[in-house]
Amino acid sequence: MNFCRFSYIRIAIVLCLCSVAWQVQSRDYVKVVDGDSLEIGRRRIRLLGIDAPEYRQFCFDAQKQKYECGKESRAYLDKMLKKARYKVDCRTQKTDIYKRELAECFIGKTNLNLEMLKAGWAVVYRSDDEAYLRAEKKARKQQKGIWQGKFLRPEYYRRLNRR
């Protein structure tokens, strides 16, 4: 009887350790897809309430020079995650029609969604969150990121460039 109880305890411990190991691995593997999308393990995550330029999208700076704003936006998000050694906590609120998790993602207490807006590398998307709206307005006023010149809002760019 003691042997059976001991075996069940060992099995329970092994199962717990396996699940913890899987969580650590999936949190360690983070891929920045573009300025508003991540892959964490097998999870596809879209940053909720923001819309960043598409990876192949171009914008125009203050001197009317064309630049790769989609790549710049992605690089900015990647830089923030790299500083945090890709340790990110994404809090899923819902799932979209493409089966991506719509989430607010954090590095510690720093909200990545909000930081992308503050830096000017994203626009508010279908959100009435006051902090998000203020951050976008401030970035626009300070001509940060995509607000330094002219750009097509990402949702319009996608409509014009459907495959």
Question: What is each model feature region?
Answer:
Residues 2-163:
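Small beta-barrel nucleic-acid-binding modules, primarily SNase/OB-fold domains
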